[in-house]
């Protein structure tokens, strides 16, 4: 009887021990949970998650926030017992809101793969946001029209190709001479309309302003400023004046023009140049009456007259930074890093990035052939990979607020119409920057 009791007790003990051991193993299973920003990519991320699970056995949960609700969704999800292990921020300003949840990624392969390490969101303590997709912008030109210009016997410049145009002085002489030959070139203006319809001026108050801000930050060796000197304001004025004075649309009529109008003017051959990014190719190709061939759509850096700009590249950056949740378990953090390194390092993952997500990758694990198959994206990759060129970072992610951008855009249009002088534009911009940055600091103190 005693022997039977010992056998039964032994079996019971093993069963209980097995249950607790099993539970312990289950609790230690690593998980990956990605809070996706873009609804249009939701299905693709689900496919990626299934492919990763099939290959590794690790489950990846994907939750996609509704359009315009990412921050609200992140606040809700990150407070839960099983929060996202991967989430997105849009730059240094956003990092300040979420820095208590961002793991240092400086020791990861993912960070070491970055072609431009300075693109990461980082400080003296570590790396906290890694760009997972990049885009680039500059001056898009129609090389077919440019070749017509270079063949003119009456032109005043001696450029043989756009390769010879590598600073602002050369660009200005080219553009101003082209404006004297509009009829011969069959165009209505060198540049497409400098759009100032409501909400359509982001190319100037954000993308163009990025250049003087980038150069000021670089000169001072800083990543942000509470007060901006706007020390490169003359350089901004150089290129902005060139745009508005050599456009197909009179300065006083720009309030009626949209970005779509500008792209149509370029696509239909009415103009030779337009400032925009690689995302514009799909728009150009779809426009009714498009006359621009893929092989003729090319990029030129936005030259403004800064010393040494002959080596300047395109403005390349992102508003999409991936972060690993530092309050997740260490196992979950490591699993999430492994997932990202599979996505951007394995053949299977890279194919999803290029073919399904359509991303230009910021990592050196991708070859030129593994970039999206459109002419502008390919040129962004080419500029990124050219070690002789210095990429202009997207420092506009540090701009203090949307209100700052709107106010600067309004000042620019008043300048276009002759209702204010340039000095007032500069002073207004500096005051707006300082006041909006001060509000950010106050908000930061309240959120602590």
Identify the role of each PLM range.
Residues 5-8, 18-94, 107-110, 153-154, ...:
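Conserved N-terminal structural module of periplasmic/extracytoplasmic solute-binding proteins
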Residues 55, 59-60, 248, 289-359:
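Extracytoplasmic/periplasmic substrate-recognition and gating elements
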Residues 59, 347-350, 361-363, 367-371, ...:
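Conserved C-terminal helix/tail region of periplasmic/extracytoplasmic solute-binding proteins
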Residues 64-73, 165-170, 253-268:
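Short helix-initiation/N-cap motifs at beta->coil->alpha
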Residues 89-147, 296-303, 323, 373:
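Hinge/lid segment of periplasmic solute-binding proteins
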Residues 106-114, 157-163, 195-198, 213-238, ...:
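Short, solvent-exposed loop/beta-turn-alpha elements that line the ligand-binding surface or hinge
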Residues 124, 128-132, 137, 169-225:
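Extracytoplasmic/periplasmic solute-binding protein
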Residues 172-176, 220-257:
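Glycine-centered hinge/linker elements that transmit conformational signals in sensory
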């Amino acid at each position: 009887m005693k022997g039977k009791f010992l056998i039964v007790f032994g079996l019971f003990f093993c069963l209980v021990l097995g249950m607790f051991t099993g539970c312990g193993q289950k609790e230690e299973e690593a998980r990956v949970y990605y809070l996706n920003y873009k609804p249009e990519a939701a299905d693709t991320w689900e496919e990626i998650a299934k492919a990763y699970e099939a290959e590794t056995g690790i489950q990846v949960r994907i939750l996609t926030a509704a359009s315009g609700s990412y921050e609200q969704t992140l606040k809700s999800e990150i407070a839960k017992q099983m929060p996202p292990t991967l989430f997105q921020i849009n730059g240094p300003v956003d990092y300040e809101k979420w820095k208590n949840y961002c793991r240092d990624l400086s020791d990861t392969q993912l960070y070491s793969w970055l072609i431009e390490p300075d693109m990461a969101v980082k400080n003296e303590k570590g790396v906290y946001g890694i760009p997972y997709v990049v885009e680039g912008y500059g001056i898009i030109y129609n090389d077919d029209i440019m070749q017509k210009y270079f063949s003119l016997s009456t032109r005043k410049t001696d450029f043989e190709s756009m390769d010879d145009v590598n600073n602002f002085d050369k660009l200005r002489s080219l553009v101003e001479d082209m404006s004297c030959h509009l009829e011969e070139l069959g165009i209505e203006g060198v540049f497409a309309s400098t759009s100032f319809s409501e909400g359509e001026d982001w190319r100037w108050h954000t993308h163009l302003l990025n250049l003087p801000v980038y150069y000021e930050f670089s000169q001072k060796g800083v990543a942000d400023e509470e007060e901006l000197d706007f020390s490169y304001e003359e350089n901004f004025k150089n290129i902005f004046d060139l745009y508005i004075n050599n456009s197909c649309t009179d300065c006083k009529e720009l309030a009626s023009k949209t970005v779509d109008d500008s792209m149509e003017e370029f696509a239909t051959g009415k103009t030779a140049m337009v400032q925009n990014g690689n995302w514009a190719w799909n728009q150009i190709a779809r426009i009714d009456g498009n006359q621009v061939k893929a092989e003729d759509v090319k990029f030129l850096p936005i030259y403004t007259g800064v010393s040494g700009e002959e080596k300047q590249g395109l403005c390349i950056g992102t508003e999409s930074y991936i972060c690993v949740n530092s309050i997740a378990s260490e196992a979950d953090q490591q699993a999430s890093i492994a997932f990202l390194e599979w996505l951007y390092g394995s053949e299977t993952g890279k194919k999803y990035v290029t073919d399904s997500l359509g991303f230009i990758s910021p990592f050196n694990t991708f070859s030129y052939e593994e970039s999206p198959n459109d002419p502008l994206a390919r040129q962004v990759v080419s500029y990124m990979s050219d070690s002789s060129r210095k990429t202009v970072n997207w420092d506009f992610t540090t701009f203090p607020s949307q209100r700052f951008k709107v106010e600067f855009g309004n000042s620019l249009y008043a300048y276009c119409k002759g209702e204010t002088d340039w000095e007032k534009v500069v002073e207004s911009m500096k005051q707006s920057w300082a006041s909006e940055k001060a509000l950010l600091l106050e908000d930061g103190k309240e959120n602590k």
